[in-house]
Every structure is written in structure tokens, then in C-alpha cells.
Amino acid sequence: VIELRNVPADDVDRMIDLAATVFHFRITDRDRMRDWVSRMERIGAYGIGGPGEDDLAGQMGVAAQRLSVPGGELDCSAVTFVGVLPTYRRRGILSSLIDRMHADAAAAGRPVAALWASEGPIYGRYGFGVADRRTGFKVDTSRPFGLRTVPDDRPLRLLDRERVPDVLGPMYARESARRPGGLARDEWWWLNRLVPHRDERSPEYGEPRVVVHPEGYAIYRTQGRTVRLYDMAAETPRVEAAFWTYLASIDLTHEIVAPERPVDDLVTRMAADPDQVTVTGDSAALWLRLVDVPAALRGRSWAADDTFVLDVADARIPGNRGRWRLTTGAAPGCERTGDAPDLALDVADLAAVYLGGTPVRTLVRVGTVDEHTPGAADRLDAALAVPLAPYTNDNF
């Protein structure tokens, strides 16, 4: 028998051990991990009445977050630390955990949930869709790195790590207001996830370095002749050019690696010699789930005035199923209707297009969205349009 219940504080170490078993990692800083897990809402699936009585068989962590969406922010359940012991697989534990998360999110008034997927096909079945992607670059700086964009010439300065939350916080908030997909960062997140003394994923890199400009910042580390860019926010292309110029000119280094950049990053277009910039990867980033479809659709701004009838399928949340009249524009609305649909789609595909990063027209071509009214996909794309591609750089 499996019983779901909240995981008490004295079981946090059991959650850490379960995660290490499932994700095959070595625990190098238990105290910091314990601090992180202690901050979450924790759901545990306990085996009751068998030979492993009171086993922690599966788990899920949820952080109460704010997600930047076009025109504002929405309360969001940030799902993490999900796992089921190999001895308890195929017993419906993950389904039970996700259903519980959906119910908790609805009760807390969070219309969306989000996660990073270690195995993407799993979460599509639960209504999650890829809402944004990341791309990676390598820049050859063994020779001068010229730019077509004139860099902003105001001075840059290095910032002490302890001042990062106060100085970078407002800059990041402005960046998130411009670009959907950002998650709120508190002081703990800045110091422990953005600029920890040691990068647990790449321990060969040195201490974090933070360079700031009145209108932006860049966080990087170095190792040998390599500069690794972790995060950058720039309010104008000229400020962005100033950071690339700075990173390319660091003495004794020959390359910049930037594995986690937005898909519309300007560096490939800024470079005077495009051959100095190599695209090294493209990967799914944030998976989004619309827990409350009408609240989510009313909760973002829209780029065009229009009206659509959407026929939404949802295998997990009955309240989302059916036909919705979506009115876009200055006063968005979403109400139930019996009218014929313009578009029919699964809630996972609605999540994929929600932040403006995936064209509806593309999903029509893929075959996962049905266009019943000719031109409806293009019209919805026009309403969903955002000036900057959605981007999430906080892997939780």
C-alpha cells in the first residue's frame, strides 16, 4: 500500500538519498542540499504494511514561485526533486504525486506549474509542454573578437559576491519583465544557485565573477583558457555588446563557452566574423503545465485583439476540458462555450505556445493541433507574439 503525505523535516535526508539513488549523483555538499530541500513543499509516497514498511518510495518537491509571463507574473508551482525508487516502479506513484501537485496548486491559486524534465516523454503525458528552449555557443577568442554592434562605453566594474542580490536583483526583475520565462530569485537563490563559491556541476571552474554595468550584468567563471558564461542581462544590444567584448578580452583565455543562452541571443549576428561563434547545442528548457486554463489565459497580455474558440483536451484535470471562448486584447477573457471550435489541441500543446516560444502554426504542421477555421493558427500566433523569445535560466 502506498500512502501520500507531507514529508517532515526529519525525513529531508531520506529525500536527498532517494534523489541520489534515482539520478545517480554523488552528494558532495549535503548541508547546502538540505537547506534547499527544506525550503520546499515536500510530498512523499510511503510504502505501508510491506517488508519495507514506511519506506520513502517516491517524492516530489514544490517551490511556491512567480513565473514571468507576457505582461506580468503568475503564481507557479515549481516542481523538482521528483523520483521513485527502482524497487517501487510501475505502481502509479508518479501519477499520484502529480495529481496531488495539481490539486495543491489549484488550492493555492497557482494557475501554472513548471519543471525541468530529466525524461521528457514522461511529462508530456501529464499535460506539460516545452514552453521555452535554450541554445549554446562557443566563441573563439584566440584572436580579436570584433563586433558589428558598437559596445556601450560606460565603465564596467567587478562586484563582490555578497552584494549580488541587492545589485543584480532589480536588473534581473527588469529583464524578466521584458522577457517571459523568468522565475523570481530571492537572496538565497542568488547566493546558493547563481553565485555559489563552487559550481557542483562543473567543479573544475573557479570562483564566480560578476561584472556589472548600469544597465546589466554578467556572471562567469574561468578554468584554464576558458571563460564560462552563466548568466547575462542587458537592457540594450549595446550593453550586451559591451559584455561580450569584456569576456572576449580577459587575459590568458582563448574561448568563451555559453551553454545556456536564449534562442534569440544576438551574439551570432553581432560577430564581425560569424565563424568565431559556433552553435553547440539546442535543448528543451522549461516544461509548463496549465493547471487552470482560463486563469492562465486571462493572466497574460496579448499582442492582438481577436476571439477564438479552443477545444482543449486534458487527461488529468477535468475542469480544463472542453471548449473555451478566448478573447485577446486589452481586456482578455476566457469563458466556456458550446460554439464550434477554431482550434482543437491538448493542454500540453497549449502550454507549449503559452509564452510565445512555439508557433501554433508549427504544431498544426506537426499534426498535434487541429485547425478547424482556416487562418486561426496564424491569428492566434499574432495574438501570442512577444518581442523577445521566452527564456528560463534557473534550473531547479
What is the role of each PLM region?
Residues 1-64, 69-78, 144-191, 225-230:
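Short amphipathic alpha-helix that is part of the acyltransferase structural core
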Residues 2, 8, 151-396:
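Intrinsically disordered, low-complexity, positively biased terminal segments
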Residues 65-67, 87, 120:
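Short coil/turn motifs at secondary-structure junctions
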Residues 81-84, 89-106, 237-248:
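Conserved acetyl-CoA-binding loop-helix of GNAT-fold acetyltransferases
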Residues 106-111, 116-137, 263-280:
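Conserved active-site alpha-helix within GNAT-family acetyltransferase domains
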Residues 133, 139-147:
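Aromatic-anchored glycine-rich loop motif in surface-exposed flexible loops
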